[in-house]
Structure formats: C-alpha cells, structure tokens
C-alpha cells in the first residue's frame, strides 16, 4: 500500500511509519517546513525506515500542490491525518485572545479539510481509500484548558463520520482513532514527573500510559483492504475515560 502520514515528525507518526514500512508499505510523510522535514527524514534514515516527504503547512496548504501531483501519479491507498498544531497556551476559553482562537481553528480545520477535499477525487477514481483521523479523548471528554483543541478535534471527528456515510459505498472507509495519554515528546513534561506517573497509574484502568507503538498497532485493521470497519471510533487509552475509583479517592 501507498500510505501518506501527515505530521510525520511526531512520535506516533514515526511508530506508524516504522510498522507499516516493515509490512512492505511505501510511506510518504509531511512536515510543516524545510527544517522539520530534513530533520525528520534524517531520523527515519537512522532507523532504516524508507520514507519520502514533502512540506505541507496548514497556513498555506495549496503550496504543496506540485508535490501532490507527483505523489498521485500512483494510487494513494491510505491517509493518516495526524498533523495538528501543538497547544502552547493552556487557558480557559475566556482567557485566550480571540484572534488566537480563530487562527488555531482556521489552521487545523481548513488545513485538514483542504487535504481531504483535494485527495477525494483521486480516491474515487481508484475506487479505494482508507482514511484514518488521529484524534484525542479530548474531543469527547473536554479536557481542561484545551478549549480550542477540543473544538477542532470534535469538528474533524464529525466530518469523518460524514465521510464514512458518503463514501464508504465507493470503498473509501473513514475511521477515527482517539488516543489517550501516550508517552510522546509532547507529553514528556507530564510522564517524566514521578508524581504525575503515580497518579496516572492509580486512575487509568490499565495502570500505565500508552506507547506510540500501541497506537500504530491499533491502526492495522483500519488500513486493511478487506476491512468492514467504517465510521468507527477506536479508543487507544488504556481504558480511559473509564477510571479506577480508588485513584480518584486516594
């Protein structure tokens, strides 16, 4: 299969790329700028993972048009929508400047939707496609001080459910993977804190945070050529939002 993974520099993207590459898939990644792309490709080479990549920036998605034209000369079988802007200001909604709220929504919604819109005609022509949104428990649980992130993820989940309804008869299947607390570079400020780790172990039903490799493993059936899953929401979270009550009461 030819697999496109957006946000290719993330730990989850790297785990997916490694797993799928070992299965014989051709992997294409995106990064938001030259520096990130070159650094990320070097990381993949160090791990002996064969990938190609191009720049895809939410603020100017059309700039990647020439790269997409080249990529689409071969059928694109699966797209993992993993790219998302990092949250830098943990505040309640009223404390965020509205221009920042609007910019975040514009980038993350329009950036992802533009790519879906651009790729659908090719998928329809090939009568095959596997679309996977890497979402978050925050889309349903409303994580504190992540108002715009929660809104954007929930909006994309709604779109993916619509895609499942409208395109599954064309063998274009759309599914959502909601991840919980995963050990990545974005969350290391939390999981490297012993006190946080102890509390997490008391609350998460499985008693531990997840690994990027576990997210990658969960995606396999969603990319299958014989899959009968569409419009599904797969939760990779160790049991969250279910919680162990002794952890809450301790």
For each feature predicted by the language model, list its residue ranges.
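Conserved glycine-rich cofactor-binding loop
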Residues: 9-10
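Conserved mid-core segment of classical short-chain dehydrogenase/reductases
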Residues: 69, 84-102, 145-148, 191-192, ...
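Active-site helix of classical SDR
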Residues: 116, 152
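Alpha-helical segment proximal to the catalytic Tyr-Lys
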Residues: 121, 165-166
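Residue(s) in the substrate-gating loop at a strand-loop-helix junction
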Residues: 136
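Short, small/polar-rich loop/turn modules that mediate ligand/substrate recognition or access, typified
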Residues: 168, 173, 229-231
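C-terminal substrate-recognition "lid" of short-chain dehydrogenase/reductases
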Residues: 209-236, 241
């Amino acid at each position: 299969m030819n697999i496109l993974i957006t946000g290719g520099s993330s730990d989850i993207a790297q785990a997916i790329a490694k797993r799928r590459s070992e299965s014989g898939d051709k992997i294409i990644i995106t990064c938001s700028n030259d520096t990130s792309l070159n650094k990320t490709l070097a990381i993949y080479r160090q791990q002996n993972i064969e990938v190609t990549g191009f720049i895809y920036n939410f603020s100017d998605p059309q700039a990647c048009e020439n790269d997409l034209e080249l990529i689409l000369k071969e059928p694109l079988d699966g797209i993992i929508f993993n790219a998302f802007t990092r949250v830098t200001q943990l505040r309640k909604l009223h404390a965020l400047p509205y221009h920042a709220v609007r910019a975040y929504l514009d980038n993350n919604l329009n950036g992802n939707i533009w790519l879906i819109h651009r790729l659908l005609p090719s998928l329809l022509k090939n009568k095959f496609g596997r679309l996977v949104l890497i979402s978050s428990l925050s889309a349903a649980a409303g994580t504190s001080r992540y108002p715009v992130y929660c809104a954007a993820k929930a909006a994309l989940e709604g779109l993916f459910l619509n895609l499942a309804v409208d395109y599954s008869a064309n063998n274009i299947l759309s599914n959502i993977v909601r991840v919980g607390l995963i050990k990545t570079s974005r969350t290391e400020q939390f999981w490297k804190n012993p006190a946080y780790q102890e509390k997490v172990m008391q609350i998460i039903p499985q008693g531990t945070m997840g690994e990027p490799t576990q997210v990658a493993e969960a995606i396999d059936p969603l990319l299958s050529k014989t899959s009968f899953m569409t419009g599904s929401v797969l939760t990779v979270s160790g049991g969250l939002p279910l919680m162990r009550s002794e952890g809450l009461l301790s």
